[in-house]
From Swiss-Prot:
Statement: the UniProt record of this protein carries the keyword Ribosomal protein: yes
PANTHER family in the cross-refs: 40S RIBOSOMAL PROTEIN S24
UniProt-annotated stretches for the region Disordered: 104-133
GO terms for biological process, alphabetical: translation
Alphabetized UniProt keyword annotations: Ribonucleoprotein, Ribosomal protein
Alphabetized InterPro entries for the sequence: eRP_eS24_sf, Ribosomal_eS24, Ribosomal_eS24_CS, Ribosomal_uL23/eL15/eS24_sf
Protein name: Small ribosomal subunit protein eS24y
One protein family per Pfam: Ribosomal_S24e
Length: 133
């Protein structure tokens, strides 16, 4: 399939020094094309903002507008990958390949839940983590 023209616009651009990132809303115009992959978006954003490591770029919450041809979502560009690992939620790190998903069995989840039910208050988090001996 031939590459069709894709236009990327950013709006509400903001530099967040506290979280060491740039954050913005991305509008992608892709007429005659179903959608644009997040990998392609990361690549184009890295060129636009001269980012050395594309792993520090996160794109999420994309919605295609009715009728197609335009999508909107959010983008974050962290100063370093370490900052991204520090501030991003775990599920987003897993999606971007910076972390691995831990597969828990159904039985483990149920046992942890039942141990936590026996304890009240702040100690509940500790009860779910370890078994009593």
């Amino acid at each position: 399939m031939a590459e069709k023209a894709v236009t990327i616009r950013t709006r509400n651009f903001m530099t967040n020094r506290l979280l060491a990132r740039k954050q913005f809303v991305i509008d992608v115009l892709h007429p005659g094309r179903a959608n644009v992959s997040k990998a392609e978006l990361k690549e184009k954003l890295a060129r636009m903002y001269e980012v050395k490591d594309p792993n520090a770029i996160f794109c999420f919450k994309f919605r295609t507008h009715f009728g197609g041809g335009k999508s909107s979502g959010y983008g974050l560009i962290y100063d370093t990958v370490e900052n991204a690992k520090k501030f991003e939620p775990k599920y987003r790190l897993i999606r971007n390949g910076l972390d691995t998903k831990i597969e828990k069995s159904r039985k483990q989840i149920k046992e942890r839940k039942n141990r936590a039910k026996k304890i009240r208050g702040v100690k509940k988090t500790k009860a779910g983590d370890t078994k009593k001996k």
